[in-house]
C-alpha cells in the first residue's frame, strides 16, 4: 500500500509522548518537540541572515507576535492546491507514489507512459498547460462564496516552484504553463482587496522525493534506476543520500544542513517576491533557527508594509508553535472539540488535494457543517477546490461553490467577524468516541449535523444560534434557559438571519423555545439572531 500524507501524519500524531503536544487543549502535535531555546550551533546559522526589523530569529522575539484582527474576522478562506502534479489528474502525491512499485499511481504511470527510468515525473510537467487559467474570474467566484482570504500553493513536495524563482530553475515561469502562477493569483486577489498567502511544502522534499532515486525490486525493470538517479536531474529530484520509502517520517531527522539552508533561501525568496500576507508550512515550523529567521522575516516584511505593525500570519502544524504565541496553529482535515483561546485554522479539501478524475467530493452540507462547527471554536476554515490541469473547476466543483455561496450570502452575518460565546455547541457529540474528538484527521469520523446540533457565535451584544437542520414548528435551545450557570440574560428578540423575519419565542427555566415557519429559508442550516442573551 502506498504511503500517503494522511498515514504519515496520522502515525506521527499517535507516536507517543515524545512527539505529542502536552500544553495544547486542541489536537496532539504532529511532529517533534521544539528544539532548545538557544543551542549555540543554531544561534546564527550561516546564510540565514535577515534584514533588521521588529522581530529577530528567536522564539523569544517571535513571542511578541499578535494575531491580526483581519484573520480573526475572516473565518473562511480558499486555497488553490494546484501545480504540475495536477497535470496527470490522478490525485495527490503522484510525484512520489509513481516511484513506489505496486502503488496505484505507479501502475497508472507505467501503463500510460512506460517505465519510470525512461519517462519520469519531469516528463509530465509539459502536460501542465493551465490553458483555461483565469485567476481574476476564480477569485471573483471565491469572494462571492464568502472567502475572506486566499492562498496559492507556491511549492509542493515535488520541488517545483510556482513563481519565477531565483534558486530553482524548475519553475512554472520557465516551463509548464510558462507563467508566474503565484503572482498571477496575488494580483487577482489584491485587486479585490483580500489578503493573499502562499503555502510551502518544501522542507520535507529531501526525504519525500528520495524514492525517485530507486528502482523496481521485481519484474522486467528490476534494478534499472529511475530517472531521479540521473545526476543531470538532481535539480528537480534532489541529491538525497538515502531513500525513504516505507519509512518516511515527518521529522527533520536525516535532513542535512545544506538542504536546510537551501530551504531558507528558497522560501525567503518567495516572501520577498510575493510579499504575502500569510505563509503556510506543511508540517512544523522547520529547521530550528533557519525557520525562526524565516518567520521573523515574514513578519518584518509585513510590518514594513503596514506602518511598523505586522499583519502577517504564519501557520504551523506543530501545535507548540502556535500555543507558544509565535504563530497560528493549523489542523489538517481536523476540528478541535473545545473553544481555543487562540485563533486557529482547519485546512481541508472537497476531494483529494490534487485533482483526480472521478473523485468523490464533499457535499455542500459537509462543507457548511464544518464551517459552522469550526467558527464557534475560534477557528477559521481554509478550503481547497482542486483545479484540473486546465485551471478551470469542473461542473460539480462549480455547483458546490455555488451552494456555499448561497448559504454564506444568507447566513454569513453569523459567521464573519464573529467571536465565540461561552460555549461552542449544544447537542450530541459530533464524534461518539471521545478519544477521537481531538485526534488528527478526524473530519471523516464526524457525523453529519442535524436539527439537534446548535452552534453559537457572537458579535457585540448579539448572540447567533446556528441550527444545522430544520425542526418541525418549534425547537428549544436548552443552553438559553433562565437561571443557569451560563447566566443568560432575558431574551428580547429572535429573528431569522436569512430574511430578518421576527419569530415568536418563549424563555423558561427549560430553555429558549423558538416557533418557526414550515419552510426553511436556507437548505443546509439556518441562523437565528438573538438579542438580550448577552
Regions of interest found by a model, annotated:
Residues 10, 31-534:
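Mature catalytic domains of secreted/periplasmic carbohydrate-active enzymes
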Residues 7-29:
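N-terminal export signals
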Residues 1-3:
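Secretory targeting signals
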